[in-house]
Amino acid sequence: MLCLPVFIILLLLASPAAPKSLETRIQNDLIRAGLTDADLKTEKGFLSGLLNVAGSVCCKVDTSCCSN
């Protein structure tokens, strides 16, 4: 009768289909979130750069569009 719990514990320890640890899943989520944030920052920087160029061209052509 005492062998049954020991056998069950050994089966659980030797299970080849053990789920990923919580720490590994958290690390993967953080890496994925970091890449998403990096993409957003690059896109915002790119768009603001385009707006600055467009604003400077507009100010050279017509001073009424400048924010001075």
UniProtKB/Swiss-Prot annotation:
Pfam families: Chi-conotoxin
Keyword Ligase: no
Disulfide bond in keyword set: yes
Protein name as catalogued: Conotoxin Lt5.2
Organism, as annotated: Conus litteratus
Protein family according to the UniProt entry: Belongs to the conotoxin T superfamily.
Tissue expression: Expressed by the venom duct.
Cell compartment(s), UniProt: Secreted
Propeptide: 20-54
Signal peptide (UniProt feature, chain positions): 1-19
